[in-house]
From Swiss-Prot:
Family: Belongs to the heat shock protein 90 family.
Protein name, entry field: Chaperone protein HtpG
NCBIfam families linked: PRK05218.1
Keyword Zinc belongs to the record: no
GO molecular function: ATP binding; ATP hydrolysis activity; ATP-dependent protein folding chaperone; unfolded protein binding
Residues covered by region (C): 561-635
Domain of life, per lineage: Bacteria
Natural source organism: Pseudomonas syringae pv. syringae (strain B728a)
Region (B): 344-560
Amino acid sequence: MSVETQKETLGFQTEVKQLLHLMIHSLYSNKEIFLRELISNASDAVDKLRFEALSKPELLEGGAELKIRVSFDKDAKTVTLEDNGIGMSREDVITHLGTIAKSGTADFMKNLSGDQKKDSHLIGQFGVGFYSAFIVADQVEVFSRRAGTPASEGVHWSSKGEGEFEVATVDKADRGTRIVLHLKNGEEEFADGYRLRNIIKKYSDHIALPIELPKEQAPAAEGEEPAALEWETVNRASALWTRPRTEVKDEEYQEFYKHVAHDYENPLSWSHNKVEGKLEYTSLLYVPARAPFDLYQREAPRGLKLYVQRVFVMDQAESFLPLYMRFVKGVVDSNDLSLNVSREILQKDPIIDSMKSALTKRVLDMLEKLAKNEPEKYKGFWKNFGQVLKEGPAEDFANKEKIAGLLRFASTSDDSGEQSVSLAEYLARAKEGQDKIYYLTGESYAQVKNSPHLEVFRKKGIEVLLLTDRIDEWLMSYLSDFDGKGFVDVARGDLDLGNLDSEEDKKAQEEIAKDKEGLIERLKAALGESVSEVRVSHRLTDSPAILAIGEQDMGLQMRQILEASGQKVPDSKPIFEFNPAHPLIGKLDAEQSEDRFGDLSHILFDQAALAAGDSLKDPAAYVRRLNKLLVELSV
């Protein structure tokens, strides 16, 4: 190393300072993961060099044998990790080691809770592995030179993790990056060959290039020259996905997942598959155990790592899976694609369409298997990713039935409010003669559970699915049936229970409707433009009145979403239904004063709107009418 020039001291980005604080104060009980993170980064740097060297072979000059070396110095209390990958320029070093250049950083920092386990997961999925060096080191030095630049353009970065870092230009003979960790007091155990070897075997055996350590040597006899330093490869150094499934242990699959997903937890499930024939490719797909913080940002980077004939081509290749599977991590290695493939080409290539279709089915099969064989694990999956899976029927018509089978709902079968009922379970419990799947959407579980719309269903013992996620009404607009049974929104249109109503019931309903024609006309006149129709209800057993949605009208949930986003909402008026057996309706029918009849009608209308979760257009008028009624009753 020559003399340092252009030396400057810079401050870390605020978010990095916060992260370093968490690292330095030992966020992790499992400190040895620092080595896994640094090796993972070095592996990525070598992958990038391999890819760039396809079009610029001269980048490999001075060392075509790509590898990672880990060494230590017990006396100096240091651990050094070196790769001969792509390397970094001065600008790269300042950008990558001084800031987090990622969208969603502010959201990420907000999500840090102070709970060590949760925070370690978040930091892992955010991909800030380099900073984990500060778990064991009180000073970190980085020496780097980008491939293709002269030796005089090396860079030296140094920091104690206390808010600032130094960066200087130095001579560096070889391309690539060397990281020197100056271990904290009490962390000397890591300056040991046996310890480092075990950590590499445990966490990084799957890395597809050699990781070398100095060979253990017997001490030189007195007067003898110490033996020349020899290196030995301590990992398997083959791409894990290229090995037969029978030869890969679960622990290896789990560690490989942590490498590709930058996660600190084991995956929930995985699927490893080799396809031969017309198309030839290998896929290794993982479902994480927990949702990333940016799951609901549909434009956030996503996708699989793409390799072509085991050469890394790109991260986050999003063309292989639909958007509703953006939580899936993993690798796809194709023999049919060109090495100079671009994102634009991926979007148009018919080979990709075939692979996407097959990989989508593979993920759905993996989820079906998980739901069937490990329902508790699937419950965890649903809690984390259920709302994203609900985007599926709109995006993926071909797999609509398969996706519908994976959906889970709360229902009137219990009071837990837990989304645990599958459509298959619902149909297995259906009443004899029931040929429909009944559901109700609303803003909250408490609101839908107590909705008057459910009264007739409770009376007849018919289960109703309770849908309260913001996406649910939109979802149901894309689901027309499941297993040949149509979906029916119990708050929409004229409720027809089909075979579940006896002929006597139907006849009685017709007679009551005829008998109440006079009341219907009076209510129409009183409510005027507020309603599209007034009719006798077949839904109610306990409540006096209810508002139903017109068959073609937009539901309340969807209306509220559009209004909140400032979009124009089509005009629609509810249907006012009343329960002729309710004492209040009897009193209303007998009311002689049309003014009082009008006030009572509007009170019933507003109460029905509130019960449906809607807000009143004129709350002051409702309060005025109610107060007037209370005064009359108290006289």
